[in-house]
Amino acid sequence: MAQAPDAFVYNATLERIVDGDTFDCSLDLGFDVKLHKQRVRLAGIDTPESRTRDLEEKKLGLAAKERLKELCVGKIKIKSLGKGKYGRILGIPYTAEGKDICQMLIDEGHAVIYEGG
């Protein structure tokens, strides 16, 4: 995965989980500037779809979505890697303890490595 300078790491608060690899959050840019309803696509991973007619994939997708929700409780940090092909922020979220949430989802079997955006 590409590395962003620390200047592009922001405090964030989860607003809504869209699926296992996408969520909406508010970003604290510092100096009392906050951006709400920012859509973040987790960089470098892909999870099963939670909105599909394939019942097995849906089950796995809902499990990934739930795990992402658990990992994003409280304050998180987002390392922004820029915008993806659909205009979403590509980012790597970190837990309050500094753990890479993308890597955790891969390690736990909820996600696979993905090179798209």
Question: Where do the PLM segments sit?
Answer:
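Small beta-barrel nucleic-acid-binding modules, primarily SNase/OB-fold domains
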Residues: 1-117
